[in-house]
């Protein structure tokens, strides 16, 4: 299954010079969506994953069905103020300013083997913050898994420099 061919590219969105990789075309295709979930899940079947953590919001779309396929729980990694119970959070830098992600304090137990999932890795800042938060909570990030890697932006290298393993189903050159 050629996942990459099912992803639409939109030039100059949301800003001039950006090539936006739109996974909605993949998500609406039942064959493509099923293949995506099955390909990611099959990689981790033998890795003794305890939880799948998905980064808001498209990481939820991919992460929850992967967790289902693996027979494990799903942990949403959300933006500040979006979770109803007590949370633990971590700040991270954006191009212009900063943001914060949070996880419920009871979502990750000490020793949990966690698969971190999102749709795309660009700079790696959000994934780095999420992995750091999981680690602070006592979890071990087994791997960071993405549908798309934009290697020219450097996110994979950033995560690997932090000692994290990274997997992506496909790559797109440029930004």
Curated annotation (Swiss-Prot):
Q: Sorted alphabetically, which NCBIfam families does this protein's record hold?
A: apt, PRK02304.1-1, PRK02304.1-3, PRK02304.1-5
Which one of the record's GO molecular function terms can you name? Answer: adenine phosphoribosyltransferase activity
Q: Name the Gene3D superfamilies on file.
A: 3.40.50.2020
**Which top EC class is named for this enzyme in its record?**
transferase
Q: Name one GO cellular component term.
A: cytoplasm
Question: Where does it localize?
Answer: Cytoplasm
EC id: 2.4.2.7
Q: What is this protein called?
A: Adenine phosphoribosyltransferase
Location, primary (coarse class): cytoplasm
Recorded catalytic reaction(s): these are: AMP + diphosphate = 5-phospho-alpha-D-ribose 1-diphosphate + adenine
BP-aspect Gene Ontology terms: adenine salvage; AMP salvage; purine ribonucleoside salvage
Q: Is the keyword Thylakoid assigned to this protein?
A: no
Query: What's this chain's function?
Result: Catalyzes a salvage reaction resulting in the formation of AMP, that is energically less costly than de novo synthesis.
Q: Name the keywords, alphabetized.
A: Cytoplasm, Glycosyltransferase, Purine salvage, Transferase
The species this protein belongs to is Nitrosospira multiformis (strain ATCC 25196 / NCIMB 11849 / C 71)
Regarding protein family, the annotation reads: Belongs to the purine/pyrimidine phosphoribosyltransferase family.
Give the record's pathway.
Purine metabolism; AMP biosynthesis via salvage pathway; AMP from adenine: step 1/1
Q: What subunit structure does UniProt give?
A: Homodimer.
Cite the CDD domains for this sequence. Answer: PRTases_typeI
């Amino acid at each position: 299954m050629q996942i990459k061919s099912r992803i639409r590219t939109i030039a100059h969105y949301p800003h001039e010079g950006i090539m936006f990789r739109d996974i909605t075309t993949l998500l609406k295709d039942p064959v493509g969506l099923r293949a995506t979930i099955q390909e990611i899940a099959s990689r981790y079947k033998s890795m003794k994953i305890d939880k799948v953590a998905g980064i808001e919001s498209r990481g939820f779309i991919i992460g929850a069905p992967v967790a289902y396929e693996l027979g494990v729980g799903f942990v949403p990694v959300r933006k500040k103020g979006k979770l109803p119970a007590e949370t633990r959070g971590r700040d991270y830098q954006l191009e212009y300013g900063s943001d914060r992600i949070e996880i419920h304090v009871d979502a990750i137990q000490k020793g949990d083997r966690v698969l971190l999932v999102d749709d795309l890795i660009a700079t790696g800042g959000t994934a780095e913050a999420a992995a750091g938060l999981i680690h602070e909570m006592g979890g071990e990030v087994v791997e960071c898994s993405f549908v798309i890697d934009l290697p020219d932006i450097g996110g994979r290298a950033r995560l690997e420099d932090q000692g994290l393993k990274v997997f992506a189903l496909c790559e797109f050159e440029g930004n």
